[in-house]
A protein has these predicted regions:
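Bacterial Sec-dependent N-terminal signal peptides
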Residues: 1-27
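Lipid interaction determinants
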Residues: 22-73, 77-175, 186-236
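Beta-propeller blade signature
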Residues: 177-182
Length: 236
């Protein structure tokens, strides 16, 4: 191979690698960045993500955002469904430069953050669930993606988050999250952040669950100790 052909081939290879890096996809999973006492937590699936920020000790909720994303030219472009700080910043869209390498995700905003991907933990209730109705199911009207008022519960790799919001008005009604387990009909949450009441952090809530006709039937007592029976539908 002549020197000219060699350098031409090398240049083409470098260009291909560069183009691939610009359009690199983000591996689905949970990503954590701990900076001093502040935790940033990302949950990412194909096309959807949430970002929650909270202090760990003492517990204090800071903010959460989430929505549908695309990756283009090294940028994470997000069309938000919810933004807990919307009344202050008015943001409905975000565009964040990023890099993905060896299980680490770097968001290159004004203050770059390096996230480490958490271990994959597969459980029966993994997925994104929308609140449908109160149980028992007697054929009553249900809420779904067509409704502006939504309550989403996002379960992934042993981490959970619920968010109540309105996609038309962008009014934010609350969120909470932490770790969870779902096994043999027992669903357990351990709260690590809660926008409505920081004092609830550390509480462990136990529920019964059953999957029936694709729905999640969720029974037990809520954070106030009141009986509850909810039916959640898997978001598609």
């Amino acid at each position: 191979m002549t020197s000219k052909k060699y350098f031409t081939t090398l240049t083409l290879c470098s260009l291909i690698v560069f183009c691939l890096s610009l359009n690199a996809q983000i591996d689905p999973g949970v990503y954590i960045s701990d900076v001093d006492n502040v935790r940033h937590e990302l949950k990412i699936t194909d096309g959807y993500m949430t970002h929650s920020v909270y202090e760990t000790s003492p517990a204090k909720f800071i903010k959460t955002t989430g929505g549908f994303y695309t990756v283009q030219n090294g940028s994470l472009d997000i069309k938000l469904e919810f933004n807990s700080n919307f009344e202050n910043d008015g943001q409905k869209e975000l565009s964040i430069p990023f890099a993905m390498e060896k299980g680490q995700l770097t968001l290159k905003g004004d203050s770059p953050l390096v996230f480490t991907q958490s271990k994959h933990v597969k459980q029966e209730l993994d997925g994104q669930w929308l609140f449908a109705t109160r149980g028992p199911d007697t054929g009553q009207e249900r809420r779904g993606d067509e409704n502006a008022r939504k309550t989403l519960k996002y379960l992934q790799d042993g981490r959970f988050q619920w968010i109540a919001y309105n996609t038309e008005t962008f009014k934010f009604h609350g969120t909470g999250g932490g770790s969870f387990s779902s096994q043999d009909g027992a669903y357990i949450e351990k709260i690590e952040y809660f926008s409505r009441d920081d004092s609830r952090v550390g509480a462990e809530l136990k529920f019964d669950y059953e999957l029936k006709d694709g729905d999640w039937h969720h029974r037990g007592k809520n954070s106030k100790g009141e009986p509850m029976y909810e039916i959640w539908a898997l978001r598609k």
